[in-house]
Amino acid sequence: MKHYEFVILFHPNQSERVAEMLERYASQIKEQFSGHVHRVQDLERKKLQYTIKSARTAKAHFAVMNVECSEECIEKMRSNFKFNDAIIRFLIIRRDKAVTDNNPALLEKDEKGSLSKADRQIASQGFTAEDIYLNIAFLREYVLETGRIIPCRAAGVTAKQQRQLSRAIKWARYLSLMPYCDRHR
């Protein structure tokens, strides 16, 4: 069995039912597919960087689940997410190992807009897209005001790190955590 991370955006009108739905999905993974749920993190309602047309809303309720399950389970969960009207968007990411601890970067509200000590440590040690796509304060350091990604020579990162940054920024934009361009602000 492989490790996966689900990022789910629920419609803000369904906020009171989010815990119930997450529990239902977790029990389905455990009972039907003999999977293992390592973490369920409810990130509360957040303002989106742009309005998602299908939901006609600029807010969403975010949740993250880390699971260990089979491909069959992933296909079933993908269809469950796709046909659930309460879910605006979802992202399924394959992880190398289980993630069991709550990520503090997801809960932080960066008011200053500058890199924290932990973010600088991430930048110096190396990173993968799976580790940084929800850390918006870190990703903003590598995006110009026009929305373009800073080239690797100017950013001072290797080509491999640049690919990881690009992938993480793409995922953050899909989840409406970062704007695609300056018109969305």
Where are the regions a protein language model picked out?
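Structured, basic alpha/beta domains of bacterial-type, RNA-associated proteins
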Residues: 2-3, 7-157, 163-185
